[in-house]
């Protein structure tokens, strides 16, 4: 369960970073 939470948290962080990078590219 702890590993799942860690993976989900890392996925959310990665998604947020990818989203921010995408916004920078558009701007």
Curated annotation (Swiss-Prot):
<keyword id="KW-0560">Oxidoreductase</keyword>
<dbReference type="GO" id="GO:0030060">
    <property type="term" value="F:L-malate dehydrogenase (NAD+) activity"/>
</dbReference>
<feature type="binding site">
    <location>
        <begin position="9"/>
        <end position="14"/>
    </location>
    <ligand>
        <name>NAD(+)</name>
    </ligand>
</feature>
<protein>
    <recommendedName>
        <fullName>Malate dehydrogenase</fullName>
        <ecNumber>1.1.1.37</ecNumber>
    </recommendedName>
</protein>
<comment type="function">
    <text>Catalyzes the reversible oxidation of malate to oxaloacetate.</text>
</comment>
<comment type="similarity">
    <text>Belongs to the LDH/MDH superfamily. MDH type 3 family.</text>
</comment>
<keyword id="KW-0520">NAD</keyword>
<keyword id="KW-0816">Tricarboxylic acid cycle</keyword>
<dbReference type="GO" id="GO:0004471">
    <property type="term" value="F:malate dehydrogenase (decarboxylating) (NAD+) activity"/>
</dbReference>
<dbReference type="GO" id="GO:0006099">
    <property type="term" value="P:tricarboxylic acid cycle"/>
</dbReference>
